[in-house]
């Protein structure tokens, strides 16, 4: 109908679901055409728009249908976040904190020191948070793009989080970031019970 050819480019302008669907569509159209990500939520800017995971959800579960397919370009403009309710900012903040927990203690301490600035949409600090989140994720993805090994660390909180979303029938009463936040706490609790307690989590001061 639209006479698409391999020289065309799809643009994903929206949050994580839009990015996943457009990316998946690009990956299976004519065996792959270019696409560009322009994420408009904090969560998508720091996580889902980068890394190359695409897919569509089904009633059977999340991520059962999808591909690894990298965008040609990701444009993250934090000015687009101004219209978001605080709840959506907090949802994205969960993914940002994840990077601090799994690989970057200095970044985690910076987040704790500047939480109020991030929550009040300080552009300078939001840019810094988005940049370091994407940088940390890129380090992992370069080593293991298809998630056969170390990339699985980026799923901290997601195993439990996806189960929570499924139990909740993927209703908007619980955002993805909120489910991941709960999932991270559950994962850290399980780790502690198995004798692999996380110092950053169990210590009264994350800097100890």
Show where each model-derived region lies:
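N-terminal small/polar loop signature for handling phosphorylated ligands or for N-terminal nucleophile
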Residues: 1-36
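A glycine/threonine-rich phosphate-anchoring loop and its flanking beta-alpha core
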Residues: 23-116
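Short alpha-helical scaffolding segments that buttress acidic/His motifs in well-ordered protein cores
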Residues: 93-97, 111, 129-137, 184
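Short glycine/serine- and small hydrophobic-enriched flexible loop segments
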Residues: 95, 166, 185-193
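Oxyanion-binding "anion nests"
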Residues: 121-168
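Small-residue-rich helix-loop
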Residues: 178-182, 186
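Conserved small/polar residues in nucleotide/adenosyl-binding loops
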Residues: 201-208
């Amino acid at each position: 109908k639209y006479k698409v050819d391999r020289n065309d480019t799809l643009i994903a302008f929206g949050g994580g679901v839009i990015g996943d669907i457009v990316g998946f569509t690009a990956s299976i159209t004519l065996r792959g055409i270019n696409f560009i990500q322009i994420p408009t939520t904090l969560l998508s800017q720091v996580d889902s728009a980068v890394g190359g995971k695409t897919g569509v959800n089904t009633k059977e579960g999340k991520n059962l249908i999808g591909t690894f397919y990298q965008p040609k370009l990701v444009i993250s403009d934090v000015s687009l976040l101004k219209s978001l309710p605080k709840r959506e900012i907090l949802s994205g903040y969960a993914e940002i904190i994840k990077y601090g927990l799994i690989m970057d203690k200095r970044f985690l301490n910076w987040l704790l020191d500047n939480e109020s600035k991030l929550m009040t949409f300080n552009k300078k600090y939001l840019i810094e948070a988005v940049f370091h989140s994407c940088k940390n994720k890129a380090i992992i993805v370069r080593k293991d793009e298809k998630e056969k090994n170390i990339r699985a660390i980026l799923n901290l909180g997601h195993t439990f989080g996806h189960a929570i979303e499924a139990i909740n029938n993927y209703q908007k009463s619980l955002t993805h970031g909120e489910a991941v936040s709960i999932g991270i706490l559950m994962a850290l609790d399980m780790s502690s019970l198995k004798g692999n307690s996380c110092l950053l989590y169990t210590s009264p001061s994350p800097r100890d």
